[in-house]
Amino acid sequence: MRSRMMAVWTSLLLAVVPSLGRSQMIDRTATRVQTTLRTGWKWLGTLRPRSVQEIEGPQNWALGCETLCRDYIYWDTYKDYVAPLGIKTIRLQGGWAKTERVQGVYDFAWLDYVIDDALSKGLEIWLETDYGNPIYEGAGTADLGAGFPTSEEGLAAWDRWVQAMATRYKGKVQKWAMWNEPDIGVRKTPEMIARFNIRTAEILKRVIPDARIGALSLARIDPRFLDDCLRVIADQGKLNLFEWVVYHGYTKNPDDAYKNVEAMKSVVHKHDPRLKMWQGENGCPSERTTKFALSGHDWSELTQAKWNTRRMLGDLGHDCISSVFTICDFDHTGREINRKGLLKINDKRNLAKVKMAYYAVQNVVSVFDCHLVRQKAYRCTIECAQPITWFAYRHDQLGSDVLVFWNGTTFPQDSNDTLPATIRIAGGKFHDPVWVDLITGRIYEIPGECRSLALERAVFTRVPTYDAPAMITDRQVVLR
């Protein structure tokens, strides 16, 4: 009898503990991130993360939950960590080859499971139409870079799958994206890419008239190539199919991307001012890797956190939607583990830890919500030994300003040495300002001798700056 009871209790524990274990790996203490950063100022508290259920309104953020279509990682491995991060929109890939293993037979069960579970957690789906399917001649393969369908048979099969997927998820998925990175691997011309985009988007719109679609999903941040693609779409009178232009483009220093991004914005505006920019995939490894983007450099969890937060806030400051790549490391079969995840894995089914970047992204998301309105004509000067990147926002309910800044002159370093800066602001809205480090989430008092507030003029002296985002805002914005 006793052994039977023990067996029952063991079964119950095995059923419950895995899910509890996944959730319990999130550190919710005020000291969840500790670095060597020293300000010399009084620590007041730490930013409180907000889950997707606690954040109202639209966001500027998206989160990568890719490669489930190729079983490089599994939804169950990390699903309990998505909603607590605070990003509502997740990027999924449609996975034609996983869904149609026998010609004409669609098994969406795997994707149903992910989408339904995500929706139950308050998430929104951004679904990408890819990749190919080797069961049809001339229809490509299931992996990145193999090229989209080109044969008559392959294209017809593609059309049927896109229609079936759109029909199945009508009412569940409104945001869609085109084939991922068609400009790498098998050579595709701008005309081929544009026409394939039109073909796919027209099917989506026919099934889901209010579908919101991102065009192109280009790997490169190449203004000329983008111009060539958009010209074809414009010449066909089909720009109205799309709401966003999606691009990726990895740079070792995240700040180095924006010269080309601004040029791309000008190209987009020339063709259709209505279209918005969406950075659809960017992230940084947490260790040295030999393959994939940003390989061959000694990254760390700290530099990953700095890189990701700089990318997010740089995108926000340049009016681009920003996607974080990716929620979890994944094991690219036949190559190596891609270590760009916010969560570290031992293998596809087992997490090792929550990385520093997870908490840093949480910090950014907890502050930069729909209530912050960018102040494009903000009157601010920052005097420092190094050029400082900065962007200003105003809270539309509290009336307080948020000034975020960092040293973006080089790629993130493992050092946390700071340089003092003097910040002068005219017309700012500060009442009880504090200094916040967005890597650790720690909030510090700005000493009286380092701040002067008078008649909407603010001067802050000896302000710590370094190669990660920090901000000055009122206490009421961050200590609520």
Where are these regions (language model features)?
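Mature N-terminal, pre-catalytic/accessory segment of carbohydrate-active enzymes
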Residues: 2, 19-75, 85
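Bacterial N-terminal signal peptides
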Residues: 9-16
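Substrate-binding cleft and catalytic face of glycoside hydrolase catalytic domains
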Residues: 85-105, 110-242
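Noncatalytic carbohydrate-binding groove/subsite architecture in carbohydrate-active enzymes
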Residues: 190-311, 318
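Aromatic/acidic polysaccharide-binding cleft in carbohydrate-active enzymes
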Residues: 284-366, 376-383
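Carbohydrate-binding surface patches
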Residues: 381-429
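Solvent-exposed beta-hairpin/edge-strand motifs
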Residues: 424-443
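C-terminal beta-strand-rich structural cap/linker in extracellular carbohydrate-active enzymes
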Residues: 447-480
